[in-house]
Amino acid sequence: MGTGPALDRRTLLLGAAAWPLTACRRENDPSLQGGWVGAAHERGHRLREPVPAAVRPVQRRAAVVIVGAGIAGLAAAREFTRQGVDDVQLLELEDQPGGNSRAHRMDGMACPLGAHYLPQPGEAAHEVLDWLHEVGLLRHEAGRRVADERHLCHSPQERLFFDGAWHDGLLPPADPGSATMAAYKRFAQLVAAAPAFAIPTHRAGWSAAHAELDGQTFAAWLDRHGLQDPALRWYLDYCCRDDYGAGLDSVSAWAGLHYFASRHGFHAPGDAESEREPVFTWPEGNAWLTERLATPMRERLHTGRVVQRVREQRDGV
């Protein structure tokens, strides 16, 4: 039958047993095509290469050069121009400003590439409050600050799927009188009694108590206060990973407490104040805010630019 190797009976039977499994293999779907959105990595790679000798530099001077047109860069440019400094230039690596507050479009629908909501700021962030009034998200009525409901999203109450059921809020459920509920309430008391925190952080000042918290991990601080409950620590670890990208064993106690004490506090299930304020959000996420910061800066904004060096000199950089 041919000159190839013979197929013995044992090999044939083993192969035949596996034939039905080939029908279970998922076929490749050519309609699902992946792609790369977000950072322009090829521009970042240029930093590894020397500048071609044929490229002749063009010198320009500006009173202020801001490297990066994320929210911080755009806000800084806005404040400079508000203070009368008109010669402000922004250099941005990507094709669009916004940093992690940019958006993408899929089939004509906008979606965020990063930050996707804005909590209503506290009184300490009065610059942000002023700007939100300026863009129409806030207004005053009868001496009260009122948010435009068209841009608000109220947190859904059933958000945690635990033991086969949905539960209110994000905390794992706990029976009244249980050790877990006691741990929740104890942590809420400690957050309420913590040293002053604020956003922005410098509005709260810095004290020896803050330095002590900053010198220990959040896990060590919880241990010191006897907070070993697994449900509480799971939630706090989740919060730290969500905001800081690291868990209780790496994040400082200052950062862990700042997450709660600078904003909405911590509320045990059933607490009358457990409902948080609604947040501002949009289909494109915080790119909605980026657009309103960037539009007045279009003539000053230079996208697709790689900054290779910033060198300090006697009277400038």
Identify the residue ranges that each predicted region occupies.
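Dinucleotide-binding Rossmann-like beta1-alpha1 core, especially the glycine-rich loop
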Residues: 109-193
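Glycine-rich FAD pyrophosphate-binding loop
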Residues: 81-104
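Extreme N-terminal leader/targeting segments of oxidoreductases
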Residues: 2-63
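Active-site/ligand-binding neighborhood in enzyme catalytic cores
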Residues: 198-316
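N-terminal Rossmann-like FAD-binding beta1-loop-alpha1 element of flavoenzymes
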Residues: 62-89
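Extracytoplasmic/secreted proteins, especially bacterial periplasmic and envelope-associated proteins
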Residues: 75, 123, 127-130, 217, ...
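Second-shell loop/turn segments in exported
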Residues: 78, 115-118, 206-208
